Amino acid sequence: MRQATVTRATKETEITVWLDLDGTGQYEVSTGIGFLDHMLEQVSRHSLMDLRVHAKGDTHIDFHHTTEDTGLAIGQAVTQALGDRKGIQRYGSALIPMDEALTQVAVDLSNRPYLIWKVDFSRDKLGDMDTELFKEWFQAFSQTAGVTLHVANHYGENNHHIVESCYKALARALRQAWEIDPRKADAVPSTKGVLGGTL
C-alpha cells in the first residue's frame, strides 16, 4: 500500500496530510483557503490519489505560510508513499485545456527537486488569494516530493482557468509518473540503481 501520513506543526501552521497514491480520487480538504482547497481537490480527483488535508494557519496575516506549508506537507507525504521509487514509470506529462487556457506540465520523479514556472497572471489576486502564491505552492511541493517539475501556460485570459489548468495538468502528469510499470515492478527506473543525488 503506497500510503503516508504527515503532520507538520510550526508557530505559523498545523497541517495533517494523509494520502494513498493508488486511490480513486476521493478527497477531504480543509486549509482555510477556499481557492486552495478547490485546487487540491482537482489534484486528488485527476491523479486518482486519495487525499485528506487539514490545515490551520495564520491566515489572519496572509495566506503565504499556509499555502507553502501545505505544499511541503503534501510533497513529503508523496515521498514517503513512493518509498524507494521502485517500479514507477518515473516520467509523466500532460497538456490540459480549460476553456481558453492551455497548460503543459512535465514531471520527473527523480528525487531531484527543481521547478521551472512559466506562468503569468494579469491580476494580483484570485478572490482573496495572491496569485504569486501558486508558484510558492508548486515550489514547496517540488522540494519535498523530490520532483523535477516544469509548468508552462501556453496561453489563456481568465486567471482562474490558467491556475486550474496548472493543477489539473500536474495531477495527470503525476498519475502517469507514479504508476507502476508491470515489466519493471522491482527495478528503480535509473541506470544508477537509485533515484536522487547528482546527475
From Swiss-Prot:
Please name the top-level EC class of this enzyme.
lyase
Its family remark reads: Belongs to the imidazoleglycerol-phosphate dehydratase family.
Known catalysed reaction(s)? D-erythro-1-(imidazol-4-yl)glycerol 3-phosphate = 3-(imidazol-4-yl)-2-oxopropyl phosphate + H2O
Do the record's keywords include Mitochondrion?
A: no
Coiled coil start-end: none
**Chief location of this protein?**
cytoplasm
Pathway listed for it is:
Amino-acid biosynthesis; L-histidine biosynthesis; L-histidine from 5-phospho-alpha-D-ribose 1-diphosphate: step 6/9
Q: Name one Pfam family in it.
A: IGPD
**PANTHER family, A to Z:** IMIDAZOLEGLYCEROL-PHOSPHATE DEHYDRATASE (PTHR23133:SF2), IMIDAZOLEGLYCEROL-PHOSPHATE DEHYDRATASE HIS7 (PTHR23133)
| Gene Ontology CC annotations of this record | cytoplasm
Q: Which UniProt keywords apply?
A: Amino-acid biosynthesis, Cytoplasm, Histidine biosynthesis, Lyase
Task: Provide the species name.
Answer: Rhodospirillum rubrum (strain ATCC 11170 / ATH 1.1.1 / DSM 467 / LMG 4362 / NCIMB 8255 / S1)
Subcellular location field: Cytoplasm
What name goes with this protein? Answer: Imidazoleglycerol-phosphate dehydratase
Tell me the GO BP annotations in alphabetical order: L-histidine biosynthetic process
EC nos: 4.2.1.19
> Which GO terms fall under molecular function for this chain's record?
imidazoleglycerol-phosphate dehydratase activity
